[in-house]
Curated annotation (Swiss-Prot):
Keyword Glycosyltransferase: no
Region (Disordered): 24-47
Glycosylated residues, chain numbering: N106, N141, N261, N337, N359
Sequence ranges of Low complexity compositional bias: 28-43
Gene Ontology MF: a single term: hyalurononglucosaminidase activity
Family the UniProt entry places it in: Belongs to the glycosyl hydrolase 56 family.
Source organism per UniProt: Conus purpurascens (Purple cone)
Reaction catalysed by this enzyme: Random hydrolysis of (1->4)-linkages between N-acetyl-beta-D-glucosamine and D-glucuronate residues in hyaluronate
Keywords noted in UniProt: Disulfide bond, EGF-like domain, Glycoprotein, Glycosidase, Hydrolase, Secreted, Signal
Protein's job: Hyaluronidase catalyzes the hydrolysis of hyaluronic acid (HA), an anionic, nonsulfated glycosaminoglycan distributed widely throughout connective, epithelial, and neural tissues. In venom, they are known to enhance diffusion of the venom by degrading the extracellular matrix.
GO CC terms: extracellular region
Gene Ontology BP annotations: carbohydrate metabolic process; hyaluronan catabolic process
Protein name: Hyaluronidase conohyal-P1
């Protein structure tokens, strides 16, 4: 089964059809086109058209509460080229990090089940609250970053460990009720299959609703993808949710450094690992040009601001690896003492962060223009997960003299360009079909239809 979310003049309709959704052999995903068309993706070999290319290769996006503006302590973000919402709002036309996206099944710390507790028992399949809530934040002609942030449980069954282990345990109990004669191994297999399918239905449908309400946005989930130990385990697990990468039009891994005692080498390994995996799944599964924006922080747990050495890792390293930018996020808890925090933040921006961001974004833009004709991003030879060391060395220097400051970089072209220097227009073999504004999502029960009036359109 698959979900189709249709936006008509006055309603948002979530429909389940009996069509099977391919799991591994087809590269299909929604794309933010006009309000009357749909992107029909196929495999990477058959379809080269993707999302629109960016106007600059790298941005730093500000996603802090608007506390400083409300307290009349201005932060000079515009002086240094940050991207931010109008009036410094947390939710706006450039970025929306959404925590409340309607009903989700979850189990409280005391063991109380809400909305079924487990995805398998989720009883609110009309998703009307999700439509209503996302409708409140609907921005006309939204082309920014749309992020759904849900962290109570994870999409992959066996990644629910630690404090999330209760979801595995309760899923096995549920399976035992249905299959009392099964042994533990068999029950675990059933629990895993049922969990993965139900989690997919919920996550995919909520993502599809956001895409339908604001089709020009780059939609995805916070913290996806991430690493899971070894590279092999990471790839095997993340390949199990390839449906999410195919549907997402933005990838938002987390590179938060929560342990202030981590060494620089450990931090670099952590950051590069998560960014590498995002680059891999984007290349293998997502629509071409799907942006990657890791979430990063400016302060450690004890409120000490990170200095340039750390910024070179949390901002500079993702830039070298070819991401679209980095989102700088902070909780409202950081601003409980607003006057002190905002005053310190302004000093940090003016003396450390701002000049670094301004220089970094300009360097990446200059490199793109010099090496790639503005038709791609520069990727450092030692940080390209998509190329082997020999390939990186072979490409190095093809587009710039050896004495150039960009001699250690090569081009990763946007989807409509190709060649070592992104100098050749790539013919597109995609076809835009006039089928209304449709976004395909995950599975629902056959015949299930939801017809919900959009509060902002109706």
């Amino acid at each position: 089964m698959r979900v189709v979310v249709v936006v008509t003049g006055l309603v948002v309709v979530v429909v389940a059809t009996a069509l099977s959704l391919p799991d591994h052999d087809v590269k299909s995903a929604s794309s933010p086109l006009s309000s009357s068309s749909v992107y029909q993706g196929s495999s990477g070999d058959d379809c080269d058209e993707g999302l629109p290319p960016p106007d600059r290769p790298f941005y730093v996006v500000w996603n802090h509460p608007d506390t400083c503006k409300r307290n009349r302590i201005p932060l000079h973000l515009d002086h240094y080229g940050f991207i931010f919402n109008k009036n410094r709002l947390f939710l706006g036309e450039e970025i929306q990090t959404l925590y409340n996206t309607g009903l989700w099944p979850n189990i409280s710390e005391t063991g109380e089940f809400f909305n079924g507790g487990l995805p398998q028992l989720f009883t609110h399949h009309d998703y009307s609250e999700t439509v209503e809530i996302l409708g409140r934040y609907r921005t006309e002609n939204f082309t920014g970053l749309g992020i759904l942030d849900f962290e109570e449980w994870r999409a992959i069954y066996d990644t629910n460990f630690g404090i999330m282990r209760k979801y595995q345990d309760e899923s096995i109990k549920l399976a035992k009720q249905r299959y009392p004669s099964y042994n533990k191994k068999e029950l675990t297999m059933v629990a895993e299959q049922e969990w993965d399918q139900a989690a997919r239905e919920i996550m995919s449908t909520k993502l599809a609703i956001g895409q339908a309400l604001m089709p020009g946005g780059h939609w995805g989930y916070y913290g996806y993808p991430r690493t899971w130990g070894s590279k092999r385990n990471t790839q095997l697990r993340n390949n199990r949710i390839d449906w999410l990468w195919r549907q997402s039009t933005g990838l938002y891994p987390s590179i938060y450094i929560k342990d202030p005692n981590m060494t620089e080498s450990a931090i670099a390994e952590f950051v590069s690992g998560n960014v590498e995996e995002a680059v891999r799944v984007q290349d293998e599964f997502s629509p071409p040009n799907t942006p990657i924006y890791p979430y990063a922080m400016l302060q450690s747990g004890d409120h000490i601001f990170f200095q340039v050495d750390h910024l070179k890792i949390s901002l500079g390293l993702p830039a070298k690896m070819g991401t679209s930018g980095v989102i700088l996020w902070a909780s409202s808890n950081r601003y409980k003492n607003a006057t002190r925090q905002c005053s310190r933040m302004r000093v940090h921006i003016d003396n450390v962060l701002g000049p670094y961001v301004e220089n970094l974004t300009q360097v990446m833009a200059d490199c793109s223009t010099t090496l790639c004709g503005g038709h791609g991003r520069c990727v450092h030879n030692s940080h390209d997960v998509l190329l082997g060391e020999t390939d990186s060395q072979r490409l190095s220097g093809l587009c710039t003299p050896r004495h150039s400051r960009f001699r250690d970089y090569h081009c990763r072209c946007y989807s409509d360009w190709e060649g070592a220097c992104c100098q050749t227009v790539r013919p597109s073999r995609c076809h835009k079909q006039q089928q209304g504004n449709v976004h395909e999502g995950g599975d629902l029960q056959e015949g299930h239809v939801v017809n919900v009036v959009n509060p902002l359109i109706g």
